[in-house]
Amino acid sequence: MAIEFAVQRLGIGDVVLVGLPDQDKAVEATVVRDIDRTETTVRATLRVEGREDFVKEWPLGELVTVVRGP
């Protein structure tokens, strides 16, 4: 069961849905490192199976869809 919550609540091990440029639909990505939080943004290193890890940045308050937790 997926749930939406503010990006500030993300933690290591959470699996979120993200859009990728070469994909038509959202894919599951796992938060794999400590999250960098600033006054205006949240940055997380994500892992998608079969790809290199990448960093995704969201503005504070944006909602993300979490598929499952750690």
Question: Whereabouts are the PLM-identified features?
Answer:
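Short, solvent-exposed secondary-structure boundary/capping segments
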Residues: 38-47
